[in-house]
Amino acid sequence: MAPMGIRLSPLGVAVFCLLGLGVLYHLYSGFLAGRFSLFGLGGEPGGGAAGPAAAADGGTVDLREMLAVSVLAAVRGGDEVRRVRESNVLHEKSKGKTREGAEDKMTSGDVLSNRKMFYLLKTAFPSVQINTEEHVDAADQEVILWDHKIPEDILKEVTTPKEVPAESVTVWIDPLDATQEYTEDLRKYVTTMVCVAVNGKPMLGVIHKPFSEYTAWAMVDGGSNVKARSSYNEKTPRIVVSRSHSGMVKQVALQTFGNQTTIIPAGGAGYKVLALLDVPDKSQEKADLYIHVTYIKKWDICAGNAILKALGGHMTTLSGEEISYTGSDGIEGGLLASIRMNHQALVRKLPDLEKTGHK
């Protein structure tokens, strides 16, 4: 028998050649794409600056957008805080003791507010560091979307985007400030807060009061929806202090400023900062100074620090040191906050409080 062979018609030869050319084209184009990606060229995700390169270094974020999301997060968290309080089912429990021996309480309001605030911010800005007072369950992957709308009051004050490297940003969330007062149904002291720090410096802050629905915000070198009062009493100031150690501050304050000084015990660091400002909330007390003499967490004070700084005020340790919002989550040196006063002169007046603050 004659050996069998394979015969191809002219059409078959043409098809075979076309298939071969197609294989060679894809191999060659893939090779070129790989070579281009080494130099950051090419526009497809995963092949250039818009893909892995951007994800690796976090890119940039717009502080104006972060302010808009921070306001929304504080309000959304506040909705949860108010809903739980009005249900009167708090599921209150203790996380342990504070350094002063008081119960460090947590409620459903804290947890649910934290969940809303954290995931709204994390979904909008996945590449930034977010520090929050309450635990975040790693298994909880809720996605809460932002509609990318910036409110008119923010656009009016912050007229242009403000881009910063994402890796320089740290967000501090307090999902429910004044939990002790919350459990006692002292609603006026309760706030939700968000702060954005850039390279450790507080740049924007939001303080929201869930029960009056008042929100204060400010951005350093940007704008604000709140302002300082027209005058402050520096000689015999009204001093707002923590309810838990008002007597400790009162003793030294009277020695420093005289017996005409008024001490205002209050709950919540957010409430105390608002006491220094022109706030159109009838439940808000007014003070000239805010003094704290014990250890305090940074999520309690960062938003207030940013707002005061944006308005020309100051918040420092009792020894006058600026507070860095990186690293550890608390400060040891007490706290002094003022606005439209000679802050360093006040620091020099309070040596005894500084010593007390380090005990």
Swiss-Prot record:
Residues in compartment: Cytoplasmic: 1-12
Keyword Acetylation: yes
Enzyme Commission number(s): 3.1.3.7
One Pfam family, short name: Inositol_P
PROSITE patterns: IMP_2
Region (Disordered): 86-106
Binding site for AMP: S242, H245, G268, K272
Active-site residues, as the UniProt record annotates them: D110 (proton acceptor), T179 (proton acceptor)
Chain ranges passing through the membrane: 13-33
Glycosylation sites: N259
PTMs per UniProt: Contains N-linked glycan resistant to endoglycosydase H.
Residue numbers binding Mg(2+) 3: E133
Binding site for Mg(2+) 2: D174, D177, D300
Keyword Transmembrane helix found: yes
Lumenal-side positions: 34-359
Metabolic or biological pathway, per its Swiss-Prot or TrEMBL entry: Sulfur metabolism
Cofactor(s) it depends on: Mg(2+)
Primary location recorded for the protein, binned into one broad class: Golgi
Activity regulation: Strongly inhibited by lithium.
Single biological process term from Gene Ontology: post-embryonic development
Binding site for Mg(2+) 1: E133, D174, L176
Family per record: Belongs to the inositol monophosphatase superfamily.
PANTHER family in the cross-refs: 3'(2'),5'-BISPHOSPHATE NUCLEOTIDASE 1, GOLGI-RESIDENT ADENOSINE 3',5'-BISPHOSPHATE 3'-PHOSPHATASE
Biological role: Exhibits 3'-nucleotidase activity toward adenosine 3',5'-bisphosphate (PAP), namely hydrolyzes adenosine 3',5'-bisphosphate into adenosine 5'-monophosphate (AMP) and a phosphate. May play a role in the formation of skeletal elements derived through endochondral ossification, possibly by clearing adenosine 3',5'-bisphosphate produced by Golgi sulfotransferases during glycosaminoglycan sulfation. Has no activity toward 3'-phosphoadenosine 5'-phosphosulfate (PAPS) or inositol phosphate (IP) substrates including I(1)P, I(1,4)P2, I(1,3,4)P3, I(1,4,5)P3 and I(1,3,4,5)P4.
Pathology noted in the entry: Chondrodysplasia with joint dislocations, GPAPP type: A condition consisting of congenital joint dislocations, chondrodysplasia with short stature, micrognathia and cleft palate, and a distinctive face.
Name of this protein: Golgi-resident adenosine 3',5'-bisphosphate 3'-phosphatase
The organism of origin for this protein: Homo sapiens (Human)
Organism phylogeny: Eukaryota, Metazoa, Chordata, Craniata, Vertebrata
